[in-house]
Amino acid sequence: IEECFADEYVAVVTGGRAENQALLNQRFDKIFFTGGKTVGREVLRHAAKYLTPVTLELGGKSPCIVDSTAKIPLAARRIVFGKYLNCGQTCVAPDYILCDKAIRDQLTDAIKSEIRRQFGKHPLENPNYGKIINRKHFQRLQGLIDSSKVVIGGQSDAKILRIAPTVMKNVTWEDAVMGEEIFGPILPILTYESLDDAIQTVESHPHPLALYFFSEDKAAQKKVLDRCHFGGGCINDTIIHLATSEMGFGGVGNSG
C-alpha cells in the first residue's frame, strides 16, 4: 500500500484500544467499520459528535436454510466452501445450517464427504488449510465444541492454532455454539419441521448479515426472500454475492 499511495490518501494503522480511541477522535468524512456490536455502538457515538456518515458491518449468526427439494451434493459442496473459507473467519460465513428434518442425515453425510474431498483425511496437516487468527480466539472456539455432538472434526493443534473442519448435529439454541457468532470452522446443524418454522426461527433472532437458502422450489425461494430480513445472500450458493460490485453491502439492525 505504501508503494502505491501517499500516507495522506491511504494509511494503515494497526493496534488495539488506544489506537482505536485515537482514530475515533479524528474528524473523518466517512467511517466504514467492520467488527462487533459493542464497538459499533462506540463508533456511532463518536461519529455523532461531528455528524460523520457511518456504514457498519457487524456480522451475526448467518443462517443457511436447506429444504427437502435442494440438490444435496451441490448444497454440501457450496456450504463447505463458504463455511470453511479462511477457517470460517469471514463475516458472511454460513454460521449454522437449518435444514428440513427429513434430509438431515443425508445432508450431514454429504457434508462429511465434501470436507474429506476438499481438505483431505487429515486437514490439520494440509498446508492449504489455514489457522485461527490468535490464541484467544482459538481458545474461545474450542469452548464452543461439544465433543458429544461432533460428527466429523473436533481435532485441534494448539501449537499451530489449527482447528479441523468440524460439524455438530443434535444442536439446540441452548448450546454454547448457538449463543454468539462462531467466526470459526465449526458448523452446527439444526432442523425444522416446516419452512414456516424455519422462517420463524430466523426472524426470532437478530437480523443476520447474510442468509443462504438451498431449494429448487421457486415459491419457497420467494417466501424466504419476502419474509426474512438480512443484509445480503444467495439462493443455492454461499459467499458469492460478494463478487459483484453492482450490489450494496451491509447488514440490517444489529448486523449493520
Stretches with model-predicted labels:
Residues 20-21, 76, 199, 222:
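Short hydrophobic/charged patches on amphipathic alpha-helices used for structural packing
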Residues 1-18:
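PLP-dependent aminotransferase-like
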